[in-house]
Amino acid sequence: MLTYETWEENETKGALSVLSWAYKEYKSEIVYACSFGVEGMVLLDLINQVNPSAKVVFLDTNVHFQETYELIQKVRERFPSLNIIEKQPKLTLDEQDKLHGDKLWESNPNLCCKIRKILPLEESLANEKAWISGLRREQSETRKHTKFINQDHRFQSIKVCPLIHWTWKEVWRYVYKHSLPYNSLHDIGYPSIGCEKCTLPVGEGGDSRDGRWAGKVKTECGLHYQ
């Protein structure tokens, strides 16, 4: 039954309760891996309500859009107490080119993601018991069975997904209601934003992730495989 007291929790579809449980359960041994997409803006706001000094890691591949880096600065200003860490890969782009050839994101996108995303996240999670992700069930077939609390065999960790029941419209409704900053690329046809080299705009009516690795069999960077 919807009451005044339960309105906030109804609006967040269980997300606040999940986050409160996660920070109580794992205390300082949990980190939010944020890509700074629109779901990330919602989660940052919710996390800030539960734990204003929470750890947030951004996997800086060095090939993100400039708009993404600009958004991170806006988020730092909006949530100054959050501990935002920009995690770098061990290899610079020049070092990667020398080892694997130019434009690895074209010749071998799986290896590129491993070097610039998966290995850095492994390092970031090495001393953590759990991590938070903005996965939603409606995003894709590979994500439709995601639970609030998941055993992550890939990273030998617990993956907490507070937004699994949120729809795309509900995410944006929350962003607008709370005047949250968001990536300006969303306004010009980019529903899902990753690295600049592997992200294209999506036409009207297209799937929200159609612009990721367009023209390739690849649909995930590898962070969310079990």
UniProtKB/Swiss-Prot annotation:
Q: Which reaction does it catalyse?
A: [thioredoxin]-disulfide + sulfite + AMP + 2 H(+) = adenosine 5'-phosphosulfate + [thioredoxin]-dithiol
Q: What class of enzyme is it?
A: oxidoreductase
Example GO molecular function? adenylyl-sulfate reductase (thioredoxin) activity
Which keywords belong to this entry?
Cytoplasm, Iron, Iron-sulfur, Metal-binding, Oxidoreductase
Active-site annotation: C221 (nucleophile)
What EC designation does it have?
1.8.4.10
Q: Which Gene3D superfamilies match?
A: HUPs
Q: Which cofactor is recorded for it?
A: [4Fe-4S] cluster
Q: How is the cofactor bound?
A: Binds 1 [4Fe-4S] cluster per subunit.
Question: What pathway does this protein act in?
Answer: Sulfur metabolism; hydrogen sulfide biosynthesis; sulfite from sulfate
Q: Which GO terms describe its biological process?
A: cysteine biosynthetic process; hydrogen sulfide biosynthetic process; sulfate assimilation, phosphoadenylyl sulfate reduction by phosphoadenylyl-sulfate reductase (thioredoxin)
Q: Where in the cell is it found?
A: Cytoplasm
- InterPro entries the record matches: APS_reductase (IPR011798), PAPS/APS_Rdtase (IPR004511), PAPS_reduct_dom (IPR002500), Rossmann-like_a/b/a_fold (IPR014729)
Q: Which PANTHER family match?
A: PHOSPHOADENOSINE PHOSPHOSULFATE REDUCTASE
What does the protein in this record do? Catalyzes the formation of sulfite from adenosine 5'-phosphosulfate (APS) using thioredoxin as an electron donor.
UniProt family annotation: Belongs to the PAPS reductase family. CysH subfamily.
**Name of the featured protein:** Adenosine 5'-phosphosulfate reductase
Q: Gene name, please? A: cysH
